């Protein structure tokens, strides 16, 4: 295992997975999502101290800051990247060095938003694993979400890398 994600699951499972990733030296994304209310501020701060990346939406970002008592800057200085999705407004990636405003990818039609966040994170993981720059990683995540929203259900979209790359080039003006 070279990369992981701790996403909404049972409370004990999330705590255990984060501890095991950290102990094994495996970089991982902490994605608290709808499980955030299961944890107190101290536990959320501990997750942030263990992880390399935090990903949340706008609402979750505010809640995470409120529950931890940490500002966005406090979180950013503890991780490689603090990633916030902003729905139709794209996303932001905050690193200790710089904040990247990532433009949205435009879908052809909106069919079902269920699973868009998961698709976004799949793009992030792929981009991080392949060593792309943050602007490209964010664009990959945004495009994955846009492609997902065009299809019903959570896993009914299918495309290969060449098709994805063509969409990426059309959306952002350069190929991967």
PLM region descriptions:
Residues 78-81, 105-175:
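Conserved post-catalytic alpha-helical subdomain immediately downstream of the catalytic base
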Residues 1-101, 132, 163, 169-176:
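Ribokinase/PfkB-type carbohydrate-kinase core domain
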């Amino acid at each position: 295992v070279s990369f992981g994600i701790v996403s909404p699951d049972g409370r004990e499972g999330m705590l255990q997975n984060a501890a095991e990733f950290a102990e094994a030296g495996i970089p991982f994304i902490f994605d608290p999502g709808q499980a955030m209310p299961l944890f107190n501020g101290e536990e959320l701060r501990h997750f942030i101290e263990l992880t390399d990346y935090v990903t949340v939406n706008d609402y979750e970002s505010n809640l995470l800051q409120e529950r931890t008592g940490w500002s966005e800057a406090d979180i950013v200085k503890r991780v490689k990247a603090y990633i916030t999705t902003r729905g139709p407004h794209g996303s932001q990636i905050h690193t200790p060095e710089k904040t990247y405003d990532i433009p949205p990818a435009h879908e052809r039609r909106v069919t079902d938003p269920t699973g868009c966040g998961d698709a976004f994170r799949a793009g992030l993981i792929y981009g991080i694993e392949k060593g792309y720059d943050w602007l490209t990683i964010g664009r990959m995540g945004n495009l994955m979400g846009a492609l997902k929203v065009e299809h019903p259900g959570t896993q009914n979209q299918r495309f290969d890398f060449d098709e994805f790359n063509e969409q990426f080039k059309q959306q952002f003006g350069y190929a991967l």
